[in-house]
Amino acid sequence: MLYIKSSNIGDIMKKILLILALMSSAFVAAQERPFQAFFGIKTENPLAVVSALDSFSNANCPGTSSVRLMQELFNGPEETTHTIIVTFPNKMSYLMWANNWTNCPAAGKFLNTMNEISEQTYQFMGMPLMGDGDPNADQVFQVFLMDVKDPASYAKAYSNLMSSGEQCAGSWALVAMGPGMNVERYGTHFAYCGFKDIDVYLDGYMSNVTPTKEYTDFIKKVSNIRELKAVNMSGVVKDWAPQQ
């Protein structure tokens, strides 16, 4: 994960808005393609974070993106306690969100509140490259952070692995990190596997004693082009969808 100790969520979210505005032209050819912004935070008051997101969502401005709050259940030595994921279904959704952000009083209130109750630990934009299943149906996720030297070859090998249908009980995806990524510490890509609930996750974890042939073949193919940085586990706290 991308760790920025001296920054807070208000300042960083303002900066990433500018970065994304400058980068938006890169999505002209793929304007119907979804992408996401990830904001990691450290907080001792998660209920206040939920309340702040409730208030912001109820204002429905700009109202063009969905928001998910994740709790980091196991993430090693990282200080991040939660991750805010903002999903844009297409480029126009983001442009409307960015253009309306400065005119939305609730946005300013949200940033001020978050400054008081949390500290931002990382931020980056992510572009899903492939995936399957409905992540909205999953509540627990295992996340693999990695540095990929040959993205095309890795994507092909990963697609073949996941198409076997035996590697993930729920949704899955491979995501390329964009603006904000820290390659040296956290790599260039992450993949996730979703589970309906913690019970399903534990069943899979406890029964995964012997790797499948497909997984063994996959490891052989990517051993020289992928460096695994970390394996984290996170759970959904709450989702907020745009109001119609």
List the predicted regions and their residue ranges.
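Compositionally biased regions
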Residues: S7-N8, S25-A26, N224
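Sec-dependent N-terminal signal peptides
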Residues: I16-S25
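Short S/T/G/P-rich N-terminal loop/turn motif that feeds into the first structured element of a domain
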Residues: A30-Q244
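Intrinsically disordered, low-complexity segments enriched in glycine/proline and serine/threonine
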Residues: N8, L17-L18, Y94
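Intrinsically disordered, low-complexity segments
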Residues: I4-K5, L22-M23, N232
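Short, Lys/Arg-enriched N-terminal segments with co-localized hydrophobic residues
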Residues: M1-I12
